Design a protein with these regions (language model features):
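ATP-binding N-lobe of GHMP and related small-molecule kinases
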Residues: 1-105, 119-130, 134-135, 331-343
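C-terminal nucleotide
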Residues: 2-27, 51-52, 57, 182-343
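Short beta-strand scaffold segments in enzyme catalytic cores
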Residues: 17-20, 44-49, 152-155, 159-162, ...
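Short, solvent-exposed loop/turn segments at the edges of secondary structure
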Residues: 39-41, 156-158, 188-190, 299
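Short alpha-helix boundary/capping segments
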Residues: 66-69, 108-112, 218-221
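Short amphipathic alpha-helical segments
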Residues: 66-73, 113, 137, 273, ...
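Charged/polar, low-hydrophobicity segments characteristic of intrinsically disordered regions
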Residues: 76-80, 151-162, 228-232, 236
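Gly/Ser-rich oxyanion-binding loop with an adjacent helix/lid
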Residues: 83-187
Length: 343
């Protein structure tokens, strides 16, 4: 075929899980379903220029620089997807990627990175093959994203997304994420203020953490809990019960870190200032009745979730009481968004 262009570009956001997944089966399948808010301002933009080649090859740059430390993970990713995207076998790719937020500063970037890369690759495949069409484009992108990073599958849609088979959401799948239709027009748009407690690289990778769930003493209990919490979360959103929503989100965050601390070997990823922030948030909520809750990724940073209508009061609270616990006073304000955009 004759191509009218040889470059594609997408930007895709990160996401914050409300229902966490922790542990994997074979082939990048999660141990339990997960549900997340898609973010808006924390995104990765990826561009790929390509030419025909005798065999597959790629060059990768991040913010204009070669990053050898990224190559092993990319090699694994491309080895996983080559059967799904046959056109890649005869292409040479020049990949350029950048984040809107600081890399290695405690913000999980694999979700935005692999989802933006997957969207570009799916668009390229659609130029050479009829297996990609308008109806399955984003589903295929979510599938491919999962093979790079499980959480990346959820970044393909917004504002609320589910990855993993569950009776709660018809059409849900272990292979890709689906958008959740919020059946409540009164459910507020949420903000996510990310408090940077630790900017360093995690001592224990999420990959190792997932592996430690294989023989975890609480493995089966966690699977049951995640399904129960998913049901509670769905009901809280549909009934506009923010108190119940907050309870589930915080329970999931604390459970995630409890699983880390009770694995063998065990490990702790939060820091003293993580606890300081949580204690101040709970006290602030009790004293002011502000609708605000915390959640945590597999790290030390704290995500504050609250309705957009409370933005100013929460900003004042952060600057007055929480910024002292942030690494060099850093925090990032984001909000729930609608998903990826074509550049």
């Amino acid at each position: 075929m004759t191509l009218n262009k040889s470059e594609v570009s997408w930007k895709s956001p990160s996401n914050i899980a409300l229902i966490k997944y922790w542990g994997k089966k074979e082939n990048q399948i999660a141990l339990n379903p997960s549900i997340s808010f898609t973010l808006k301002n924390c995104y990765t933009s990826t561009s790929i220029s390509f030419i025909k080649s005798n065999n597959f090859q790629y060059e990768f740059k991040f913010h204009g620089n070669h990053k050898p430390e990224f190559i092993p993970k990319l090699d694994v990713f491309f080895s996983r997807i080559k059967k799904c995207l046959p056109s890649l076998s005869k292409l040479s790719l020049n990949i350029n990627s950048f984040n809107s937020f600081p890399h290695s500063r405690g913000i999980a970037s694999s979700a935005s990175a692999f989802s933006s890369l997957a969207l570009c690759l799916i668009e390229i495949e659609s130029m050479f093959s009829n297996i990609i069409n308008e109806d399955n484009f984003f589903e295929k992108a979510s599938f491919i994203s999962r093979l790079g990073s499980g959480s990346a599958s959820r970044s393909i849609y917004g504002p609320l997304t589910c990855w993993g088979k569950t009776e709660l959401y018809p059409g849900s799948s272990d292979q890709y994420a689906i958008p959740i239709n919020i059946k409540n027009n009164n459910f507020p748009t949420f903000c996510d203020s990310i408090l940077i407690v630790d900017s360093g690289i995690k001592k224990v990778s999420s990959t190792l953490g997932h592996q430690l769930m294989d023989n975890h003493i609480f493995k089966n209990e966690r699977i049951s809990q995640s399904h129960l919490n998913s049901s509670k979360l769905k009901k809280s959103i549909e009934s506009n019960d923010i108190n119940s929503f907050q309870e589930v989100v915080e329970n999931e965050a604390l459970t995630l870190h409890a699983l880390m601390m009770t694995s063998n070997p065990n490990f702790i990823l939060f820091k003293p200032n993580t606890i300081n922030i949580i204690e101040h948030v709970l006290k602030f909520r009790d004293e002011t009745n502000t609708k605000i809750c915390f959640t945590l990724d597999a790290g030390a940073n704290v995500h504050l979730l609250y309705p957009k209508s409370s933005f100013q009061i929460v900003q004042d609270f952060i600057k007055k009481s929480l910024i002292v616990f942030c690494d060099e006073g850093r925090f990032i304000n984001d909000e729930v968004g609608l998903g990826p955009e074509k550049n």
